[in-house]
Regions:
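Active-site/substrate-binding loop(s) of hydrolase catalytic cores
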Residues: 1-144, 152
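Catalytic cores of processing enzymes, dominated by hydrolases/peptidases
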Residues: 102-103, 134-196
Length: 196
């Protein structure tokens, strides 16, 4: 992602192209907004530079924020259904992953990015997560018609698979909220190999 940003800025500065796209012309009427990290506290914990919250359950590698809430389970898109699934799987309080909080948008990071999207009225979003080489594009009946084609074009450009999120990963995420709320295309791109 950082390499892409560097290439994009260099192409714009030099009046060049990137992937056969004239960047200067493309950015005349379009904007590209990049939020490099929505969860800096969680990253610090995952890297061992900070301690997890005192009452958090031990276990999986750390994916949650500093409060032990998994931000990709905290958005108001099927949150109640997701919360029941979390409880059935034993995620009942703060921990390293899959606990969506006491209510949707309970976390400052969730509220910040949702408010930012509403204020800026984005046409689409791309959320980059780590591991899986997969692209998710749908959220039930709210999925815009052109989303599948857009996901297939993305997949063809990078060799990833277009997939459907399952079970506990099928609600409460940023992409889900954006599609549900804005009625526009949203994508989660699982970059890199491996599993969470």
């Amino acid at each position: 992602l950082f390499r892409f940003c560097e290439d994009l800025l260099l192409a714009q500065e030099q009046g060049g192209v990137l992937g056969e796209i004239d960047i200067t012309k493309a950015l005349e009427n379009h904007s590209l907004v990049i939020v490099p990290c929505l969860n800096p506290d969680g990253v610090q914990i995952a890297l061992g530079k900070d301690q997890p919250p005192p009452k958090s359950a031990p276990g999986s590698p750390w994916q949650a924020n500093g409060n032990g809430v998994d931000l990709n389970h905290n958005f108001d898109a099927g949150w109640e259904l997701l919360h029941k699934m979390e409880e059935q799987e034993g995620y009942i309080g703060p921990g390293p992953t899959r606990y969506g909080g006491k209510r949707p948008h309970s976390e400052p990071e969730t509220r910040a990015i949702a408010g930012f999207c509403l204020a800026c009225d984005f046409r689409r979003v791309y959320a980059f997560h780590s591991q899986g080489e997969e692209i998710y594009y749908e959220y039930g009946a709210d999925t815009p018609n052109r989303s599948r084609l857009m996901a297939e074009v993305l997949a063809a450009s990078c060799g990833y698979k277009v997939c459907r999120p399952e079970k506990i990963a099928s609600h409460g995420g940023f992409k889900d909220w954006f599609i549900h709320t804005m009625h526009r295309p949203g994508f989660t791109i699982e970059i890199g190999r491996g599993k969470n």
